[in-house]
A protein has these predicted regions:
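Short low-complexity stretches enriched in small and charged residues
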Residues: 8-17, 21-25
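Long terminal segments
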Residues: 1-12, 47, 53-121
Length: 121
């Protein structure tokens, strides 16, 4: 099952492939992160990026970085055609999971594409 993720402008940036190890892919097929226990999002480089819970991608401070269609409060754009997936890299040793902050209603200062790019090896 695939779930599209949109940035705070409603542009599709990535998708979560639940059938491929809960991996987040960019539309060009690059695997950038994965969903771990307790809704924690880690990059393949081992960095904790944030959390994905109830359709919202949140940064380490609890601000909204992106969302799925069901959680959208704005009109979202059509998803592009997916490219072939690039082989996933080996997961590096994970950082110690941070304590979840209080969820904020505001958007993060970082865009979803940059947020996910922080997880690339």
């Amino acid at each position: 099952m695939m779930e599209t993720l949109y940035d705070n402008n409603g542009t599709p940036v990535a998708y979560l492939d639940k059938d491929d190890g809960n991996t987040f892919f960019l539309w060009n097929g690059v695997p950038v992160a994965y969903l771990d226990k307790d809704y924690t999002v880690y990059g393949f480089n081992g960095m904790q990026l944030g959390w994905y819970f109830n359709g919202y991608m949140r940064d380490l401070k609890g601000y909204i970085v992106g969302f799925n269609k069901q959680s959208a409060s704005i009109e979202v754009k059509a998803s592009p055609i997916k490219s072939f997936k690039i082989t996933k890299p080996v997961k590096r040793i994970k950082q110690i999971r941070r304590v979840k902050p209080i969820w904020k209603r505001n958007n993060s200062a970082i865009c979803l594409s940059q947020f996910l790019a922080n997880g690339i090896n």
